[in-house]
C-alpha cells in the first residue's frame, strides 16, 4: 500500500523543470516552428503528490495550465516567452528563439530566468521591465475556496535560474533545473482527537479560517498595502476527508497577535447516553502561531489538536486551545517514487512539546546516512526564592536518550519526566555524513509545572521597588495539564461575578467602580484554573479583612480611595502589575482576582514538595481565597507572620487563557 511521507529538503521540488536541447527526445511530428537549432527545449516533470491524507483529492494544487519564461539581464527585462507543449499531456515543451535574441544569447551574457506558472501575463498585465518591480507583482490568482475545496484559480508558482545562454552550442542551450514553488501557503487542520469525559461527538466537526491574506506578491515577503483580511466559511471534516484545508498568501503579525491567522472549530457534543438532538455546538479558537509569526510561501502549516475541555457556546467568543503545529515545505513523495538527486536533511518537527509523556518520535529525511546524535543535553530554568534565575543541567538517568532507526526513518527520544515541577528543555543535534545538521529542541512538561516572567512595577509599588525583606519580582505561572489521581480537583477557569464598589452619603449610595470577583460558592472553591499567574512580591500586602460592605442583598461593597485601607476583595479588583515583553513593550495586567481555596492549596503543595526547586512562593501563615468565612492556612513549615483566619495576606491571581503551553479550558457558566 502506498503511503505519503512529508519531505522537506534543501531544494524541495514541487516540480523540476528540465530545460535543454534534447536531440534524442524530439518527436518527428513536431510543428514546423520548432527547429532544433533555433529553439530551447524543456521537460516538465511534476511530482503529483502533495502533503495530504489518504483518500483526499489533490485540489489542483499541482496543476499547470500555462507557463511563462521571463529573462532579465542586469535587472532589466530583455525577453518574455511562453513555452509550447510538443503534444498533449507529454510534459515536453519548446521555446522558439527569435533571431533578434541571438545577439543576446551569444554565451557572453548572464541572465536571470524566471519561470512563472498559471499567471496570465497578457494585455496590460505584463511582467515589469524592472526585475525588482517584477518580483513585487501582485498575483491576481484567487485562493478563496469553492465548494469542492479547490481554489477559484490555479496556484501561481515561480522559480528561477541563472544561466549564460549560447545558441551556437548544444550545451549553451541547456538551462539546467528550475525549482518551481507555489506563491501561496497551505494551512490544514486535522480532525481532532476528542477526550472529554462523559461527552461524545454528534456529526462531523467543522472549521473555518480567519485572517486569510487573499493577495500576495510574486516573490516578495511583504503584505500588500490596502489589502484586508478575509474569512473563509466552515468546511466539514468527514470520514472521507479527515481534515480541512485553507490557503493564504504571505502574512506576518505583531507580538500582540493582531492579524494572526486562526481556525475556528465547531463540535456538536452531547452527554453520553442522551439523544442526539440534545447536542449543542461548542466553539474553539486554534491559533496558527509559528515561532517567526509569519505565513510563508509554499509552506504547509499542519495543525493537530486534542480536545479535552468543553468549548464556548458563543461563536463570537470561542475557547482558545493550542494544537501541535508543524511547519514544513509544502511537498511530499510516496515510497515508490525516486527522489531527485539532491542533498538534504530534514527533521520533523524541529521544535515540539512532550506533555506528560516519556517518549516521542520524530521523522527524518536525509540524502545520506545519519551520524550518532550529538550534544544531547537537558536543562531546567527557574527563579528561586531570592529572585535569581537559575539554569540547572541534568545528569545521569535524567539525561534523555536519542536513538536513530534507519529502517523506519524515525528518531526516538526517551526522557524521564521531571519531578521538580519545572519543564525540562531537551536539545540535541542531528547530522548526516555530508555535514548537514539540524538542531532539535523539545520541552517536556510534567502534569503540573511552574514557569515565570518578571514584574517591573505595580499599583502597590508604582516605583518598582520591593518592600523591605522582599526580593522576588517573579510572576509565577502555574500550569495544570492533568489533575491529581485523587479526583478532588476540578480543572476549569473559576467563574466570576460582577460587583459594585460604593460610597455612601446619608441613605444614598454612589457607584464608584465595578469589577469581577471570584464566585463565593463551594463548587468554585474546589476549582483550579488550568493556567494561572500569581502576582509577584510587588503585590505583597499586609494582613487585611476579606471584605467590607454596606449591604449584602444587594451586595454593595465599600469603596476606599486610599489603598492602605483596602480589603482583600478590593485589593485584587483594583490591582495591576506591569512587565516587559520580549519586544521591549510594557504590558499592564489588570484582570486579577482572589484565588480559589484549591489554587492556594495547590501552590502550597508545590512549594512544599521535596523535589521541587521553586519554594517560598506564599510564605505567610494565612491567605484569603474567594471564600469570605475564613482564610486558608499555609502548611509550609517556614510560614511566618501575624496573619489569622480572619485577617490574612492577599496574593492575587489571574487566568492565562491564551497559554502557549497548555490547552485553555472553557470558562464555566453560572
From Swiss-Prot:
<keyword id="KW-0564">Palmitate</keyword>
<comment type="similarity">
    <text>Belongs to the FimD family.</text>
</comment>
<dbReference type="GO" id="GO:0009289">
    <property type="term" value="C:pilus"/>
</dbReference>
<keyword id="KW-0449">Lipoprotein</keyword>
<dbReference type="GO" id="GO:0009279">
    <property type="term" value="C:cell outer membrane"/>
</dbReference>
<keyword id="KW-0472">Membrane</keyword>
<feature type="propeptide">
    <location>
        <begin position="25"/>
        <end position="50"/>
    </location>
</feature>
<keyword id="KW-0732">Signal</keyword>
<keyword id="KW-0281">Fimbrium</keyword>
<dbReference type="GO" id="GO:0046810">
    <property type="term" value="F:host cell extracellular matrix binding"/>
</dbReference>
<keyword id="KW-0843">Virulence</keyword>
<comment type="subunit">
    <text>Fimbriae are composed of a major, structural subunit and the minor components FimC, FimD and FimE. Identified in a complex composed of FimC, FimD and FimE (in vitro). The complex interacts with host extracellular matrix proteins, including fibronectin and type I collagen. Interacts with host CXCR4.</text>
</comment>
<feature type="signal peptide">
    <location>
        <begin position="1"/>
        <end position="24"/>
    </location>
</feature>
<protein>
    <recommendedName>
        <fullName>Major fimbrium tip subunit FimD</fullName>
    </recommendedName>
</protein>
<feature type="lipid moiety-binding region" description="S-diacylglycerol cysteine">
    <location>
        <position position="25"/>
    </location>
</feature>
<comment type="function">
    <text>Probably a component of the fimbrium tip. These long, filamentous pili are attached to the cell surface; they mediate biofilm formation, adhesion onto host cells and onto other bacteria that are part of the oral microbiome. They play an important role in invasion of periodontal tissues and are major virulence factors. FimC, FimD and FimE contribute to interaction with host CXCR4 and thereby down-regulate the TLR2-mediated host immune response.</text>
</comment>
<feature type="lipid moiety-binding region" description="N-palmitoyl cysteine">
    <location>
        <position position="25"/>
    </location>
</feature>
<dbReference type="GO" id="GO:0098609">
    <property type="term" value="P:cell-cell adhesion"/>
</dbReference>
<keyword id="KW-0998">Cell outer membrane</keyword>
Amino acid at each position: 500500500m502506498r503511503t505519503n511521507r512529508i519531505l522537506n529538503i534543501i531544494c524541495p521540488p514541487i516540480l523540476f523543470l528540465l530545460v535543454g536541447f534534447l536531440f534524442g527526445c524530439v518527436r518527428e511530428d513536431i510543428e514546423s516552428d520548432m527547429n532544433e537549432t533555433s529553439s530551447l527545449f524543456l521537460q516538465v516533470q511534476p511530482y503529483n503528490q502533495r502533503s495530504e491524507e489518504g483518500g483526499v483529492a489533490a485540489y489542483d494544487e499541482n496543476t499547470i495550465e500555462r507557463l511563462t519564461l521571463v529573462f532579465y539581464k542586469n535587472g532589466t527585462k530583455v525577453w518574455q516567452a511562453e513555452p509550447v507543449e510538443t503534444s498533449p499531456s507529454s510534459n515536453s515543451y519548446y521555446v522558439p528563439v527569435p533571431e533578434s535574441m541571438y545577439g543576446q544569447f551569444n554565451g557572453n551574457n548572464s541572465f536571470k530566468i524566471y519561470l512563472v506558472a498559471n499567471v496570465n501575463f497578457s494585455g496590460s498585465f505584463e511582467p515589469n521591465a524592472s526585475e525588482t518591480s517584477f518580483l513585487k507583482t501582485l498575483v491576481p490568482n484567487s485562493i478563496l475556496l469553492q465548494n469542492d475545496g479547490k481554489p477559484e484559480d490555479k496556484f501561481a508558482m515561480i522559480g528561477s535560474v541563472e544561466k549564460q545562454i549560447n545558441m551556437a552550442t548544444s550545451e549553451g542551450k541547456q538551462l539546467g533545473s528550475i525549482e518551481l514553488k507555489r506563491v501561496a501557503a497551505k494551512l490544514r487542520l486535522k480532525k481532532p482527537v476528542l477526550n472529554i469525559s462523559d461527552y461524545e461527538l454528534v456529526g462531523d466537526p467543522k472549521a473555518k479560517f480567519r485572517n486569510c491574506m487573499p493577495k500576495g506578491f510574486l516573490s516578495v515577503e511583504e503584505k500588500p498595502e490596502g489589502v484586508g483580511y478575509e474569512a473563509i466559511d466552515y468546511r466539514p471534516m468527514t470520514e472521507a476527508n479527515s481534515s480541512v484545508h485553507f490557503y493564504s498568501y504571505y502574512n506576518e503579525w505583531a507580538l500582540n497577535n493582531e492579524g494572526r491567522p486562526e481556525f475556528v472549530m465547531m463540535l456538536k457534543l452531547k452527554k453520553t447516553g442522551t439523544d442526539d438532538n440534545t447536542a449543542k455546538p461548542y466553539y474553539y479558537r486554534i491559533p496558527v502561531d509559528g515561532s517567526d509569526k509569519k505565513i510563508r510561501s509554499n509552506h504547509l502549516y499542519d495543525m493537530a489538536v486534542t480536545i479535552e475541555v468543553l468549548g464556548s457556546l458563543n461563536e463570537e467568543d470561542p475557547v482558545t486551545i493550542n494544537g501541535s503545529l508543524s511547519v514544513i515545505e509544502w511537498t511530499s513523495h510516496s515510497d515508490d517514487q525516486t527522489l531527485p538527486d539532491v542533498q538534504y536533511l530534514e527533521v520533523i518537527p524541529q521544535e515540539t512539546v512532550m506533555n506528560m509523556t516519556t517518549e516521542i518520535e520524530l521523522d527524518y529525511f536525509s540524502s545520506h546516512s545519519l551520524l550518532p546524535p550529538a550534544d544531547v543535553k537537558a536543562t531546567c530554568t527557574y527563579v528561586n526564592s531570592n529572585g535569581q534565575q537559575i539554569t540547572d543541567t541534568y545528569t545521569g538517568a535524567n539525561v534523555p536518550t536519542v536513538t536513530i532507526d534507519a529502517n523506519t526513518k524515525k528518531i526516538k527520544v526517551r526522557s524521564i519526566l521531571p519531578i521538580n515541577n519545572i519543564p525540562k528543555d531537551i536539545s540535541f543535534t542531528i547530522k548526516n555524513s555530508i555535514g548537514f545538521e539540524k538542531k532539535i529542541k523539545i520541552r517536556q512538561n510534567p502534569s503540573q509545572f511552574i514557569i515565570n516572567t518578571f514584574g517591573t512595577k505595580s499599583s502597590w509599588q508604582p516605583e518598582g521597588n520591593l518592600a523591605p525583606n522582599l526580593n522576588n519580582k517573579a510572576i509565577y505561572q502555574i500550569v495544570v495539564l492533568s489533575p491529581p489521581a485523587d479526583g478532588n480537583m476540578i480543572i476549569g477557569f473559576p467563574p466570576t461575578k460582577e460587583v459594585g464598589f460604593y460610597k455612601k452619603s446619608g441613605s444614598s449610595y454612589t457607584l464608584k467602580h465595578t469589577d469581577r470577583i471570584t464566585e463565593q460558592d463551594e463548587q468554585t472553591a474546589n476549582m483550579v484554573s488550568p493556567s494561572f499567574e500569581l502576582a509577584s512580591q510587588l503585590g505583597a500586602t499586609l494582613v487585611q479583612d476579606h471584605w467590607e460592605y454596606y449591604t449584602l442583598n444587594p451586595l454593595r461593597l465599600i469603596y476606599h480611595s486610599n489603598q492602605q485601607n483596602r480589603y482583600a476583595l478590593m485589593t485584587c479588583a483594583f490591582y495591576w502589575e506591569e512587565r516587559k515583553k520580549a519586544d521591549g513593550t510594557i504590558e499592564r495586567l489588570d484582570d486579577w482576582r482572589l484565588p480559589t481555596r484549591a489554587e492556594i492549596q495547590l501552590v502550597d503543595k508545590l512549594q512544599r514538595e521535596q523535589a521541587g526547586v521553586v519554594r517560598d512562593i506564599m510564605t505567610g501563615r494565612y491567605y484569603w481565597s474567594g471564600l469570605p468565612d475564613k482564610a486558608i492556612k499555609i502548611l509550609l513549615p517556614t510560614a511566618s507572620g501575624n496573619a489569622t483566619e480572619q485577617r490574612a495576606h492577599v496574593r492575587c491571581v489571574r487566568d492565562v487563557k491564551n497559554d502557549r503551553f497548555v490547552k485553555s479550558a472553557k470558562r464555566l457558566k453560572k
